[in-house]
């Protein structure tokens, strides 16, 4: 071969005798595409929140689909079989990411690492009859154990449903997206600790607490919270450039509201209703909740203007709108 002759001549002549020269062609920096930049932002956010990235095979066992109680009508039950699998535990292409990540968690727990926050960004494969399978890029998150190691001043709390929900909401905010989170019914999640994730009315994922009986199948004995999101919308619509505004010079006004709320009415729905009533409402939060004869929920609403100091009349008018809006909902009364 021509290159072999050149190499042999150079060896005989002596590599040290060949002068160093600058390449004739100009060096160009590779520009990352927009989607790769969104992925980097997504990963940076999760790492800054204390998550570690895991990478798994894109395979799973057929029994994993059965373990997670996926019904035949669900697209995630339509797996692509592998002709020559490395083992029966990896006999099909994965249709969702939970089984492999739960195995990662079990592996670490068995080695004494019990406080775990991990994520994986990878592809899932859905069978499409005689055609090539559909490939989707998904993001999977998992949290289990305590928030931190033991601390002399206080006992660290365990992760819960609201921790995984807060991470998903924070990710949406970082990417300039609006996720709508509603009560869900995934078969492998605990009742009342399960939610679906929507953008513009389209479901893109789920989050919640994995059922104890399913965790035991993977030798996990501690509560585990997970989420899985399809990334196509995120990559297309994620915002990379933000416009910052100055910290407001004018003081906030704070009002507290207490309502009796039926169990059937989601508190998140009430928070969204309050936020949408006025651009002067900058935050809404629940600061107290108790149940005696009825469930009582107390909200703290913060008002602020970037242009002027708010007058009492302005805040009082919005306050009355909040009361009128919420008391129109069936099952809600003002607590006096």
What are these regions (language model features)?
Residues 4-8, 59-64, 95-142, 224-240, ...:
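Conserved alpha/beta core surface patches that mediate binding of polyanionic ligands
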Residues 70-71, 107-108, 128-131, 185, ...:
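A generic local secondary-structure boundary/capping motif
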Residues 14, 50, 122, 145, ...:
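Glycine-centered flexibility sites
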Residues 1-116, 255, 302-304, 314, ...:
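Extended, well-folded interaction surfaces typified by the phenylalanyl-tRNA synthetase beta subunit core
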Residues 28-36, 87-95, 111, 130-132, ...:
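Hydrophobic alpha-helical scaffolding
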Residues 12-27, 78-83, 124-154, 249-256, ...:
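Residues forming anionic-ligand binding surfaces in small-molecule and nucleic-acid pockets
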Residues 11, 51-52, 87, 106-107, ...:
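Residue-level marker of positions within ordered structural domains that often coincide
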Residues 2, 56, 65, 148-336:
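A carboxyl-terminal module marker
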């Amino acid at each position: 071969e021509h290159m072999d002759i050149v190499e042999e001549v150079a060896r005989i002549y002596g590599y040290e005798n060949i002068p160093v020269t600058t390449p004739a062609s100009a060096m160009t920096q590779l520009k990352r595409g927009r989607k790769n930049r969104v992925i980097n932002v997504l990963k940076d956010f999760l790492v800054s929140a204390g998550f570690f990235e895991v990478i798994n095979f894109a395979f799973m066992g057929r029994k994993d689909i059965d373990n997670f109680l996926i019904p035949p009508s669900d697209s995630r039950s339509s797996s692509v079989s592998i002709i020559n699998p490395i083992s029966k535990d990896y006999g099909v292409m994965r249709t969702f990411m939970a089984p492999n990540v739960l195995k990662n968690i079990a592996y670490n727990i068995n080695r004494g690492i019990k406080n775990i926050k991990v994520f994986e960004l990878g592809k899932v494969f859905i069978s499409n009859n005689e055609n090539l399978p559909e490939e989707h890029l998904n993001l999977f998150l998992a949290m289990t154990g305590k928030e931190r190691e033991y601390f002399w001043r206080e006992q660290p709390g365990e992760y819960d449903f609201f921790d995984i929900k807060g991470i998903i909401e924070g990710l949406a905010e970082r990417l300039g997206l609006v996720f709508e989170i509603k009560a869900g019914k995934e078969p492998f999640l605990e009742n009342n600790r399960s939610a679906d994730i929507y953008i513009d009315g389209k479901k893109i994922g789920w989050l919640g607490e994995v059922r104890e009986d399913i965790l035991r199948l993977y030798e996990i004995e501690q509560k585990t919270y997970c989420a899985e999101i399809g990334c196509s919308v995120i990559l297309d619509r994620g915002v990379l450039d933000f416009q910052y505004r100055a910290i407001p010079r004018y003081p906030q006004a704070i009002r507290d509201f207490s309502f009796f709320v039926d169990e059937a009415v989601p508190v998140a729905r009430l928070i969204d209703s309050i936020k949408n009533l006025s651009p002067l409402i900058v935050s809404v939060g629940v600061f107290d909740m108790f149940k005696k004869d009825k469930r009582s929920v107390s909200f703290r609403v913060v008002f602020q203007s970037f242009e002027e100091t708010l007058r009492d009349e302005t805040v009082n008018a919005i306050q009355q709108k909040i009361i009128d809006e919420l008391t129109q909902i069936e099952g809600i009364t003002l607590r006096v």
